[in-house]
Amino acid sequence: MTASSSDGAHGAVDRKLLDILVCPITKGPLEFDAARQELISRGARLAYPIRDGIPIMLPEEARKID
């Protein structure tokens, strides 16, 4: 998984947490999009939101991506 460092402006996510999270659908790696505060699953083509520093790993909460 690739994780960018966060400046805390949008709510920091613990780097260790990002290193262990995987997509709940594909079990594949996630990429951290700091600008959008999302975890991206390329395999599932979904973006999981991060709210108040907490990743919301529910497929029904994820945004579909192209």
From Swiss-Prot:
Coiled coil location = none
InterPro entries found in the cross-reference section: Trm112-like
Q: Which domain of life is it from?
A: Bacteria
GO cellular component terms, alphabetically, are: cytosol
What SUPFAM superfamilies does this protein's entry cite?
Trm112p-like
Q: Which family does it belong to?
A: Belongs to the UPF0434 family.
This one is known as UPF0434 protein RPE_0408
Source lineage: Bacteria, Pseudomonadati, Pseudomonadota, Alphaproteobacteria, Hyphomicrobiales
